[in-house]
Design a protein with these regions (language model features):
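A short, proline-enriched helix->beta-strand linker immediately N-terminal to the Walker B motif
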Residues: 153-157
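Helix N-cap at the start of a conserved alpha-helix in ABC-type nucleotide-binding domains
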Residues: 170-172
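Helix-to-loop junction immediately C-terminal to a conserved catalytic motif
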Residues: 49
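Short coil-to-helix segment of the ABC ATPase nucleotide-binding domain corresponding to the Q-loop/switch region
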Residues: 94-101
């Protein structure tokens, strides 16, 4: 599902973000990507949806070989990969329904499909009653639920979540993670970057640890928690 072979990333000013990364994530896995700030977590995730490109190595995401991906194919890749950010990135002048519908409109879905999909994902994240609310009328946790709903509206096979609970209080963070668990149970592969040890310890999925741009640990389900 996701495969990185000897992947390295260096920025123009000489900063090395990733060094010789080898990582395989199977279909249906839930994987935590953890490590200190500057360890390369966000860079690795950006490579997977072609926000950035590696300098060396091979990346495969689903059916896409990113080394051979043409610019016109990037939108097709991004329908396969949903992305959730720490800062929500909702459009302030659109209500909840419209924020999610917009993600479907740009891919050319029909009005009937859009209506059904928005209803489906709002029910999944527990916000069907907030469809007509605007972002400034929502709590931080509610805004993140909308962002998650938008990310899965196209039914992506993979969901990348970069610090999705970073700005939230512990109780709200736990609620957001339970939403991600529900999505995972539907068969979606999830890669989640986080600093939240409480969530990692509680839910016990596979843990990949980055330090200095290198993978220093890759613990299968339960192993990290037994040795942590």
């Amino acid at each position: 599902m996701i495969q990185l072979q000897r992947v390295s990333k260096q920025y123009d000013k000489g900063t090395i973000a990733l060094r010789d990364i080898n990582l395989f994530i199977d279909k249906g896995e839930f994987v935590y990507l953890i490590g200190p700030s500057g360890s390369g977590k966000s860079t690795l995730m950006k490579l997977l949806y072609r926000e950035e490109m590696q300098n060396r190595g091979t990346i495969r995401v689903g059916d896409f070989n990113l080394n051979k991906l043409k610019e016109r194919q990037v939108p097709h890749l991004r329908r396969t990969v949903g992305v959730v950010f720490q800062d929500f990135k909702l459009l302030p002048k659109l209500n909840v329904y419209e924020n999610i519908a917009y993600a479907l409109e740009v891919t050319g879905e029909s009005g009937r499909t859009i209506k059904a999909r928005v209803k489906e994902v709002l029910e999944l994240v527990g916000l069907a009653h907030k469809a007509k609310s605007y972002p400034n009328q929502l709590s931080g946790g509610e805004q993140q639920r909308v962002a998650i709903a938008r990310a899965i509206a196209n039914r992506p096979a993979i969901l990348i979540a970069d610090e999705p609970t970073g700005n939230l209080d512990p109780e709200t963070a736990m609620g957001i993670h339970r939403v991600l668990e529900s999505i995972h149970r539907r068969g979606t592969t999830i890669l989640m970057g986080t600093h939240n040890d409480t969530l990692v310890d509680h839910f016990q999925h596979r843990v990949v640890v980055l330090e200095g741009g290198r993978i220093v640990r890759d613990d299968r389900k339960g192993d990290y928690h037994e040795s942590h």
